Curated annotation (Swiss-Prot):
Protein localization: Cell projection, Cilium
A cellular-component GO term for this protein: cilium
Region named Disordered: 1-42, 179-287
Organism: Homo sapiens
Protein name, UniProt field: Ciliary microtubule inner protein 6
Assigned keywords, A-Z: Cell projection
The encoding gene: CIMIP6
Region named Mn 1: 128-160
InterPro entries: CMIP6 (IPR031365)
A Pfam family this chain is assigned to: CMIP6
Length: 287
């Protein structure tokens, strides 16, 4: 332990001697300004330090002494970095035209102005700069819009109702125009009676009539000729009503009508002739 203390004392003495020697050298250089010592590092752009002082009136540090060093005294030469003599240039403004489509406040109104009188039915509303809402708006235009909320917030998946109540939803009420094709048509007059549950038979009858008419339109003249040829065969067993319905189904030229009339006579005769003949002839027994 004693050896360590002796070493510490020796180091302190050496440090004190070094500082003492350095102070003496600085004093000698100040006394003899002619002789200068060249240092290895060049100190460029550093002002000469004349004195150092402490600032004791600093409220930020509770008036503790704050070291402050003054730089080299004298006027510093700097370039003119701010132009004092030049005047500011006028700001460019775009040309203003009172006859533009956006501004019509300086133009004369097309209709004569009338002072607005409250609850006056005889006078017309005044035509000014501010657009006035015309009271005679039709109800059809108002019904062409649907009102809804623009955006909905406060969605919480952890709660049992995920979305908030209707009255507590955040957003603005916006109107959306209804397209003419998207609106459902309301039945009028007889359509209301036909749409009732008791009018199913009438609907079915209309559907069958429409189906029959569509089928009759779709029949081609080639099919009509095939039907007439089938009727001319002697082995067909058709009645007069069936033949007449087939003739009505395929209207054609008067020549074809004559042919069909002759075919009906032959088919009727064949049908009467076949009625007397038995359908199944008796089988002869071999003796």
């Amino acid at each position: 332990m004693e050896e360590k203390e002796d070493k510490h004392q020796q180091h302190k003495i050496e440090d004190a001697a070094i500082t003492y020697v350095s102070e003496n050298e600085e004093i000698k250089h100040e006394e003899k300004p002619g002789k200068s010592i060249h240092h290895s590092k060049s100190h460029v752009g550093r002002g000469r330090i004349y004195y150092a002082k402490f600032i004791n009136t600093n409220a930020r540090t509770y008036n503790e002494p704050f070291p402050y060093i003054d730089p080299k005294k004298g006027p510093e030469i700097q370039g003119d970095w701010w132009s004092h003599g030049k005047a500011l240039e006028p700001v460019f403004l775009p040309p203003y035209d009172s006859k533009s489509t956006q501004r019509s406040d300086f133009q004369k109104p097309s209709c004569p102005l009338v002072l607005p009188v409250k609850h006056s039915k005889m006078q017309k509303p005044s035509c000014g700069i501010v657009p006035l809402a015309s009271p005679g708006t039709s109800a059809e235009l108002q019904n062409n819009f649907i009102e809804y909320i623009s955006f909905i917030h406060q969605y919480d998946a952890r709660k049992t109702p995920n979305e908030p109540l209707q009255g507590k939803r955040h957003g603005a009420f916006v109107q959306r125009e209804i397209k003419p094709g998207s609106r459902p048509t309301v039945p009028k007059g007889a359509e209301v009676l036909l749409n009732t549950p008791g009018s199913r038979s009438s609907e079915q009858s209309k559907k069958t009539e429409k189906g029959n008419s569509a089928e009759s339109r779709m029949i081609s003249p080639g099919l009509c000729q095939q039907n007439s040829q089938e009727l001319l065969e002697p082995k067909t067993h058709l009645s007069e009503t069936d033949v007449r319905q087939a003739a009505k189904a395929c209207p054609s030229t008067p020549e074809s009508r004559e042919k069909t009339s002759g075919a009906t006579q032959t088919t009727v005769g064949d049908a009467l002739f076949t009625r007397h003949k038995p359908l199944n002839p008796p089988i002869k027994k071999s003796e």
